Amino acid sequence: MYQIVLGKVSTLSAGQLPDALIAQAPQGVRRASWLAGRVLLSRALSPLPEMVYGEQGKPAFSAGTPLWFNLSHSGDTIALLLSDEGEVGCDIEVIRPRDNWRSLANAVFSLGEHAEMEAERPERQLAAFWRIWTRKEAIVKQRGGSAWQIVSVDSTLPSALSVSQCQLDTLSLAVCTPTPFTLTPQTITKAL
């Protein structure tokens, strides 16, 4: 089973939240997205299992809980991928111009990924950049790795993992799962 839920950070992190949750939340710019992620998780699973953190900081449920999850946010949108199949990774990005995105692609994309981007019409290359970027991030996150490892990932090569991506309006969403799964708009639930 794979469950994908999208929500709005501003909505999920506002309103009446349990004092214990607010006390655990980090301060600063990560606070709203952290709270939104915990709210999404608690809506999907009640009671919420105890959480632990991996070597690179990836949150997970404690041993003995046969569920895995991954969270990602960009702008005001947050994505939750929940699984009973094994470790998962997801990445969501708002498709937006970014300073020196071509230089970044040259630095971290494989030859195959670069060829995929360059094969697009010029007006579609920015969307292709984000499509490839989200796939790479989802793979790294599935492994529990750090952002620095993105350069070592080639999302165009065959893999034992399943990597799927879709574009939703101005959002690029990718998932990396241990068993076959195809991401489509119909497989995504929107949080209220």
Swiss-Prot record:
Its EC number is 2.7.8.7. The keyword Transferase applies. Keywords: Transferase. Pfam families: ACPS. GO terms for molecular function: holo-[acyl-carrier-protein] synthase activity; magnesium ion binding. The keyword Transferase applies. GO terms for biological process: lysine biosynthetic process via aminoadipic acid. It comes from the Bacteria. It catalyses: apo-[ACP] + CoA = holo-[ACP] + adenosine 3',5'-bisphosphate + H(+). One of its GO terms (cellular component) is cytosol. Belongs to the P-Pant transferase superfamily. Gsp/Sfp/HetI/AcpT family. PANTHER family: L-AMINOADIPATE-SEMIALDEHYDE DEHYDROGENASE-PHOSPHOPANTETHEINYL TRANSFERASE, PHOSPHOPANTETHEINE TRANSFERASE. May be involved in an alternative pathway for phosphopantetheinyl transfer and holo-ACP synthesis. The native apo-protein substrate is unknown. This is 4'-phosphopantetheinyl transferase AcpT.
